[in-house]
Amino acid sequence: MSIITDVYAREVLDSRGNPTLEVEVYTESGAFGRGMVPSGASTGEHEAVELRDGDKSRYGGLGTQKAVDNVNNIIAEAVIGYDVRDQQAIDRAMIALDGTPNKGKLGANAILGVSIAVARAAADYLEIPLYSYLGGFNTKVLPTPMMNIINGGSHSDAPIAFQEFMIVPAGAPTFKEALRWGAEIFHALKKILKSRGLATAVGDEGGFAPRFDGTEDGVETILAAIEAAGYVPGKDVFLGFDCASSEFYDKERKVYDYTKFEGEGAAVRTADEQIDYLEELVNKYPIITIEDGMDENDWDGWKKLTERLGKKVQPVGDDFFVTNTSYLEKGINEACANSILIKVNQIGTLTETFDAIEMAKEAGYTAVVSHRSGETEDSTIADIAVAANAGQIKTGSLSRTDRIAKYNQLLRIEDQLGEVAEYRGLKSFYNLSK
């Protein structure tokens, strides 16, 4: 009764109006699962391959019909007949069917869509929530959210190099309260921006994208919004950055060139100067997490950054690790970073996603489950964060339904868990000494 009888993919649109995949899996019992695949704007060069059509006459070359056809004509034939509950076997079968190290033949987007849909169908068959199916009986930790309320870099047209300015309501007693705090700060920030005559349009991830006078102006404005909402920076609410440094790293000159986003007169920094600058910000502001502070291939820089700041903040590897256990293992061995960002489409299956989370935890690294800038209404990452007891999630600002869908799912999960639910706040940053 739990045998897969049909797999079907279609092309749908993501939050940027670009094509992506939606996959449906059906079983003999009538149990059903659907998965939708996100897409990134600033992507690591070592990520699994997102297969696009390249036909400029259709969606500007971004169509996903090749990936859809791979699901319907190749993958479906391979997985029909499997027990839908055998997630690892199905994921491994798809990896073997692709046969490349980066899923470049079938496409990580094709494989991931099936992987998510299989898990959802299994949960439906067992009549249990997805987080319970993926995580088992010890699932209980609601993640501390990192809310991207200012969008810069490749996620907006704002003249700021850093891609994300985040608030982290780690002092809240519950996830529900953390979400409320974040929403109140978001609206307080909007009022401040309006009072300054700055734009309140939002970027890809729902954060504002105003023309600040540099990074520190953005930080100071966020701190003012936290206080205006009635909260205390550094006690109730902390700050975080996604620098996305690879987006403005000049490989030929080996410098971090802020002029790419901030224009003429902006800083151009060596690796050591980049670390000095980040340390200045950490010493001045209540920053608790810095993602991709160095270029994805700057291993020496990552090691120095971790040595300097790894006890004060969590240096998080996103483009640096690309949710891949091979890169993570190297990072652990070389003492680079102390946290990994988890993006399901960077690696392409749920099995490999959980492998990366487990490896991180065993090494004392934290795992931050994350969305992509091109999202859908699919809320699977909310269930993954709870299933893995990851303790941290990054899923955008307090606007745009593609972001709110994940927050609302976490509210449902918190309700379902009842008294068992734990919101650990600062304790989720167990890799820090402060």
Swiss-Prot record:
Belongs to the enolase family. It comes from the Bacteria. Pathway: Carbohydrate degradation; glycolysis; pyruvate from D-glyceraldehyde 3-phosphate: step 4/5. This is Enolase. InterPro entries: Enolase (IPR000941), Enolase-like_C_sf (IPR036849), Enolase-like_N (IPR029017), Enolase_C (IPR020810), Enolase_CS (IPR020809), Enolase_N (IPR020811). Mg(2+) binds at D242, E291, D318. One of its GO terms (biological process) is glycolytic process. Catalyzes the reversible conversion of 2-phosphoglycerate (2-PG) into phosphoenolpyruvate (PEP). It is essential for the degradation of carbohydrates via glycolysis. It is an enzyme of class 4 (lyase). The lineage of its organism: Bacteria, Bacillati, Bacillota, Bacilli, Lactobacillales. The active site is at E205 (proton donor), K343 (proton acceptor). HAMAP family: Enolase. One of its GO terms (cellular component) is peptidoglycan-based cell wall.
